[in-house]
């Protein structure tokens, strides 16, 4: 496997595993234990970059990825996203986008719990919210990083 550096020091496998389809975003959810095995098999073959999002499920994909990667957390890079207007308690979708700073912070906190981790390695905007200036989005991300 080849590896690349993102930014200053985030080393990832050249091939990443997008986990969206594992929890039924399109069609039926795959067998949970089979998907955990697939994630482990990918890691065993050198994949260290795993992508998920709150919107997948919603929430169930982050939970699956968190469970699968918990035993090897310090050896992998996890990416997740924000930007949809999803009720963080019920999972109900409004059909819109939401990148208000307070929502981004809440999504990050909830993702940490679902992913069973103390950090999100790559956290990015899934959909642009035209109601929120990009400077506001960048500012809250910078606050979360520091």
Q: Residue ranges of each PLM-predicted region?
A:
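A periodicity- and composition-biased signal for non-globular, repetitive helical segments
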Residues: 8-10, 87, 133
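Small/flexible residues
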Residues: 4-6, 83, 102, 129
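Low-complexity, flexible helical/coil segments
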Residues: 49-55, 85-88, 113-117
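A short alpha-helix capping/helix-coil boundary motif
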Residues: 16-19, 45, 87-90, 119-122
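Structural motif corresponding to the early beta-alpha repeats
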Residues: 71-99
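Glycine/proline-rich, positively charged
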Residues: 89-146
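N-terminal binding-site loop/beta-alpha segment at the start of enzyme catalytic domains
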Residues: 1-80, 146
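Feature marks short, surface-exposed loop/turn motifs that line or immediately flank catalytic pockets
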Residues: 21-24, 56, 84-88, 126-129
């Amino acid at each position: 496997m080849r590896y690349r550096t993102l930014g200053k020091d985030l080393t990832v496998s050249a091939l990443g595993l997008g986990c969206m389809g594992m929890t039924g975003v399109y069609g039926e959810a795959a067998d949970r234990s089979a998907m955990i095995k697939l994630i482990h098999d990918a890691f065993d073959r050198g994949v260290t970059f795993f992508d998920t999002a709150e919107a997948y499920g919603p929430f169930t994909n982050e939970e699956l990825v968190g469970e699968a990667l918990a035993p090897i957390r310090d050896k992998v890079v996890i990416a997740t996203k924000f930007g949809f207007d999803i009720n963080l308690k019920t999972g109900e979708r409004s059909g819109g986008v939401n990148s208000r700073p307070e929502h981004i912070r809440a999504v990050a906190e909830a993702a940490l719990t679902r992913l069973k981790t103390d950090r999100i390695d790559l956290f990015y905007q899934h959909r642009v919210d035209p109601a929120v200036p990009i400077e506001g989005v960048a500012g809250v991300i910078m606050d979360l990083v520091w």
